[in-house]
From Swiss-Prot:
A divalent metal cation binds at residues 6-7, 101. It catalyses: Endonucleolytic cleavage to 5'-phosphomonoester. Its main location: cytoplasm. It holds the Pfam family RNase_HII. Residues 1-203 form the RNase H type-2 domain. One of its GO terms (biological process) is DNA replication, removal of RNA primer. Changing residue 6 to N: Loss of activity. Changing residue 129 to N: Lowers activity by 50%. InterPro entries: RNase_H2_suA (IPR004649), RNase_HII/HIII (IPR001352), RNase_HII/HIII_dom (IPR024567), RNase_HII_arc (IPR020787), RNase_HII_hlx-loop-hlx_cap_dom (IPR023160), RNaseH-like_sf (IPR012337), RNaseH_sf (IPR036397). Disulfide bonds: none annotated. Changing residue 7 to N: Slight decrease of activity. Its cofactor is Mn(2+); Mg(2+). This is Ribonuclease HII.
Length: 205
């Protein structure tokens, strides 16, 4: 059995980091489903495919809350945290080989480190979601899970956009929260976007 692993939300400033793993012995069924990089699919299509993927594959999902990320980033980089999450998913699935979308600039280094941690064969590559259907499937599961978490957070805290710093709506809401002095727990406080906006808010006074 082979597995694919990918993440969603690595670069967002609001919401969790989600890592998903998909294991399957029949990749052809994934190909026939039309599984491809989640960013190239509409949200509705991702939801449909996620349901189909869960029927034919074993899936594992790991969510890291903003508070947990902030705590861990006191001593680690986001890529080190991701590596730990990937290792946990690999150990849960125990595949013969795991294909991983690499956040590391040197994918071979990530492959080696994950193999040392898990004792299993790992192939880490850039844009693995475009090459391996299993990684594309993991990308879809991760993105769908993140989107659901974001919707839950919006019900609680209001519409803050996508949660990514590049989104003007997200930045505007962050500014309002910072100015009010009440920043909700869904915000990643250690992100540079937050510290930059906090400084700008102070400078405006």
């Amino acid at each position: 059995m082979k597995a694919g692993i990918d993440e969603a939300g690595k670069g967002c400033v609001i919401g969790p980091l989600v890592v998903a793993g998909v294991a399957c012995s029949d990749e052809d069924r994934l190909r026939k489903l039309g599984v491809k990089d989640s960013k190239k699919l509409s949200q509705g299509r991702r939801e449909e495919l996620a349901e189909e993927i869960r029927k034919i594959c074993r899936t594992e999902v790991l969510k890291v809350s903003p508070e947990n990320l902030d705590e861990r980033m006191a001593a680690k980089t986001i890529n080190e945290i991701l590596k730990e999450c990937y290792a946990e998913i690999i150990l849960r699935l125990k595949p013969e080989i795991a294909y991983v979308d690499s956040p590391d600039v040197i994918p071979e280094r990530l492959s080696r480190e994950l193999e040392e941690i898990t004792g299993l064969r790992v192939v880490a590559e850039h844009k693995a979601d475009e090459k391996y259907p299993l990684v594309a499937a993991a990308s879809i599961i991760a993105k769908v899970e993140r989107e659901r978490e974001i919707e839950r957070l919006k019900e609680k805290f209001g519409d803050f956009g996508s949660g990514y710093a590049s989104d003007p709506r997200t930045r505007e809401v962050l500014k309002e929260w910072i100015a009010s002095g009440r920043i909700p727990s869904c915000v990643r406080m250690r992100w540079k976007t937050v510290s930059n906006l906090r400084q700008k808010t102070l400078d405006d006074f």
